Amino acid sequence: MATKTQDSKYSRLKIKASTTDKIGSKLLYQYLVEKAKAEGISGATVFRGIMGYGTSSKIHSSRFWELTEKLPVVIELVDTTDKLEKFFKEIEEELLSMPKGCLVTMEPTEILLQKKGK
């Protein structure tokens, strides 16, 4: 059954980094999605960009001759504002300890439809 949910305030947490960034031995995006699932966050999606730049101001783009591409990546999480604020507090120190830069934003969002899969 599909439901429209607006009982709580929802937000979208975005972590913008690079496809090659790591936490320990794991890729950052893999680590964050697995941690979000373990913490019960409603949804997580990873988007890989074809071009972009961040805090280093160096433009990164897709090149067919490169085996390992350093491309922009956005990890997007959606859940209640309270759960996402708690999740961010848990990962903040790990993000700060990374040698490379990242950008984290959070914005309110409205869930129009949430249908569970089988």
Question: PLM ranges: what are they?
Answer:
Residues 1-118:
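Positively charged, small/polar-rich N-terminal and surface patches that mediate targeting and assembly
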